[in-house]
UniProtKB/Swiss-Prot annotation:
Region (Disordered), start-end ranges: 1-23
EC number: 3.4.24.-
Protein name as annotated: Mitochondrial inner membrane protease ATP23
GO cellular component: mitochondrial inner membrane
Amino acid sequence: MSKNADLEAIPAAEEIKKPNPPKEEASIKGFTWWRRTLQYNTGLGLSEDEKLNYENDYKYILERKQCKQCYEYKDWILKYSPTVTFMIQQIAKLSDGNPNIDGKNLKPFDESKIICDICPEWKSGGFHPDLGILICQNRIRNKWHLEDTLAHELVHQFDNLKWKVNWLNLKQHACSEIRASSLSGECRFGQEFARRGFGFKIANGHQECVKRRAILSVMGNPNCKDRAEAELVVNEVWDSCFNDTRPFEEIYR
């Protein structure tokens, strides 16, 4: 499984407990919710049970809002992103039941295999060959972050269909991570500058970003002993995998 890492060093996974639905829907709407918020913020007449119920309901509202926003972003990106729509077309050509290589009369891409959910890990998305693509709704910063994340995971899906990747094989995993970070757009100048500011190197900055993110992802592989092994494996496959831009003719973003 792919882990789309965003940080220099990956923090430990959070312990996330999903909130329970509110006892009454009316309690999180209108005047009642405003009153509860005011009471929580001031502490006036607030019992411990009321405090815990408010915190649960606040988290419930936040997660529901994140989920709605994530699916809205996803639907927009699937419709309007040139990178994502191109990847979907290429994946459709490789999918079972789609032997028509000229791209005509293809079965539609199964968008239900792209889901939004809460992720305890500090990653923005993931790919599983049997389950599909996960978008981490609590880690997505904006629509364009979701576009990069989805493009990254679609490269993994393409690789898995074309080459039957063994995700526990470190070299195969590393190769797909290199390609996904390079082709998705997540290492383009604007994104790296936003993340790293003036620490971003204009010369070879794209390559350094791709290598850094690939190493972090390979470190999450259960067969990887440590960072040193991840770096070794990424370096071993670097030249061939970085220069392989399929299904694009070149690095598009």
